[in-house]
Amino acid sequence: MALPDENHVLLFISLIALKKKLMKITVNYVSPAEALSVIQPNQRVFIHGSAHTPTYLLEHLAKEAYRLQNVEIVSISVYGDLHIDKPEFKDNFHINSLFVSASIRNAVNSGYADYVPVFLSEIPELFKQDILPIDVAIVHVSPPDDHGYCSLGVSVDIARSAVNTARYIIAQVNPNAPRTHGDGLIHSSRFHAMVYCEDDLHTANFTEKSGPETLKIGGFVAGLIDDRCTIQMGIGAIPDAVLKCLYNHKDLGVHTEMCSDGIIDLVEKDIINNKYKNIHPNKTVSSFALGSKQLYDYINDNPAFAFLDIDYVNDPHIIRRNNKMIAINSAVEIDITGQVCSDSIGTYQFSGVGGQMDFMRGAAVSEGGKPIIAIPSRTAKGVARIVPTLKPGAGVVTTRAHVHYVVTEYGVAFLWGKNLRQRAKALISIAHPDDREALDKSCFERFKLF
């Protein structure tokens, strides 16, 4: 009997390997209604956030309202139409958010949603210690790879901890979701139900808000950053403006809770290369990303990025291990003693505590580190941001004892180690010129001698 030639043997082996590969990645997708049927009245449901907000499943969850009552929704920064946050669903779903994004701001301030003030670094402990035990987690992931692993993509943040502690896990599986290196891999066998969709991820554009004023602020902040520093940026136009002012710097690193489009060009030009970081050298470390599709495509399967758990990334003890750590954050207003309100306008809840204090403290105790608050001297409507006292009901996110540098378009005020009078003088010097006389008067009335 003639033996098969070498080519036939190789073809046969290849077909067997292909069959095994296909068997490994076979996925049984179900309908949204079937997946969501596990959710019952009086349960607590975690919703994935930021770019990965699972809008497709949320739309279908709203259709399940007729059978649900008192379902608590826990999330951080969600984007897009949530569908379940409408007043008509107030008896069915109750949002208990750990941050206030634009999508739920009206609901929180209208009284049919709630906000939990908490440091981002501590949110996983709320899940682990059963203070906020999760019954069901809904996450938005990439399809399984050859080994069955899906990725939480550009939103690992608190989602990893929610998955680790939830009793049931529902996955919205999307080929448009990027795969990232780090802590975001979850084997598909962990999911109790998987629903397929092809929605685009949520995007945000911070660069369009940058103007001459914010670029001036960016320039002053850039002047506080030395070569070989490791930087953290908050969300918004000012952190993005800072990145635009770093093109003459060398060998910068990134350890941040979030990143956006501004880092791409700096990475491409080798300005951000992470060479001199004390921990995770050669890696841009983040917990989530929010920006354009270009950003998500750039991060996709890019080993130069590591997306890690929020309780690690935002841990001040981890942050401080990078020497020359620079934390750059913004605020709503600052009083003349240095108290920083970043989450509210008076009693109006605008955002949340977030990770500002995590990084302000971590940078302060880093060797050569600098915690920076950067704000325009006035709002777009001409309202002063440096004020005698914070608005009644305003929340203090960063205490005056934690504030070191404050930057406006008029310069830099260094507050650490200064007494209250000295702080007031320093802050008045960077306030809007038209606000300084009134601030001087307030300081004289408060401190008597000024």
Task: Describe the residue ranges of each PLM region.
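Conserved alpha/beta enzyme-core scaffold
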Residues: 16-450
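Short hydrophobic alpha-helical segments enriched in small aliphatic residues
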Residues: 6-9
